[in-house]
Amino acid sequence: MDIYGLIGNPVEHSLSPPMHEAAYDARGIDARYVTFEPTKDTLETAINGANALDIAGINVTIPFKQDVLNHIIPDDIAREVGAVNTIKFHDGETPRGYNTDVAGVKRAFQHHNISIDGYDAVVVGAGGAGRAAAFALADAGAHVHIANRTVERAETIATDIGGQATAGGLDTRDEISDADILLNATSVGMDPDSNQTPVPQSYLHDGLVVLDAVYTPIETRLLREATAAGATTIDGAWMLLYQGVVAFEIWTEQDAPIQQMNAALRAELEDA
């Protein structure tokens, strides 16, 4: 039996185990997906222990996505983004690290047949999710503006991306009025504060594509108001699904059973 898992703190409410175990069942893989909660002080021990115990691969979540860079060999995307969320072990060798959050953003748009190349995109939030989203959109050809309460953090991302990326504060009326894509990469609107929204409804407009990284609730206030404004909406579960899809494909070198993974994920969200 192969063992995969998730390292983070906390991880007790993670939706990854049912999603990945549905994939193993669908592909006839004898595997389990388990969770681990190390501390920052025991992270290196946890990574080395997983490697020594022949664990096949692990996902990494908050607060360790940056810290694990010190213990693995990152691929080019993970190195550019400065964060790892997927690790693959290789027979005791130094583990390889990947950032599938970037691919998760791209494939969420692809799933909905939405082109990114040449579009103007606004990313709200300059944390880890915002950084991955901004890099994903820029890599796919979008002109990206990062908006954040602390402008310096947004400016850092824009500088790292280079090209035409720009940055500013949270007053994004002008940027969103000209934008084709809006992506919320903050936790604003997440349960139990689902009455909140990161962007005033008056900023939203027909022709805009709005992706909210928040997936509890599935339909956030931002998405409801975007629909009312005539925008196209994508819920955050699609990002979660596709980062898991890409992780599965890295680990197993098989095509992921996307339908079964999506069904398991959304069943868990309905029960949450």
UniProtKB/Swiss-Prot annotation:
Its EC number is 1.1.1.25. It is an enzyme of class 1 (oxidoreductase). GO terms for molecular function: NADP binding; shikimate 3-dehydrogenase (NADP+) activity. It comes from the Archaea. NADP(+) binds at residues 76, 125-129, 148-153, 213, 236. InterPro entries: Aminoacid_DH-like_N_sf, NAD(P)-bd_dom_sf, SDH_C, Shikimate_DH, Shikimate_DH-bd_N, Shikimate_DH_fam, Shikm_DH/Glu-tRNA_Rdtase. The keyword Manganese does not apply. Pathway: Metabolic intermediate biosynthesis; chorismate biosynthesis; chorismate from D-erythrose 4-phosphate and phosphoenolpyruvate: step 4/7. It catalyses: shikimate + NADP(+) = 3-dehydroshikimate + NADPH + H(+). SUPFAM superfamilies: Aminoacid dehydrogenase-like, N-terminal domain, NAD(P)-binding Rossmann-fold domains. Keywords: Amino-acid biosynthesis, Aromatic amino acid biosynthesis, NADP, Oxidoreductase. One of its GO terms (biological process) is amino acid biosynthetic process. Pfam families: SDH_C, Shikimate_DH, Shikimate_dh_N. Shikimate binds at residues 14-16, 61, 85, 101, 215. The active site is at residue 65. Involved in the biosynthesis of the chorismate, which leads to the biosynthesis of aromatic amino acids. Catalyzes the reversible NADPH linked reduction of 3-dehydroshikimate (DHSA) to yield shikimate (SA). PANTHER family: BIFUNCTIONAL 3-DEHYDROQUINATE DEHYDRATASE_SHIKIMATE DEHYDROGENASE, CHLOROPLASTIC, SHIKIMATE DEHYDROGENASE. Homodimer. This is Shikimate dehydrogenase (NADP(+)).
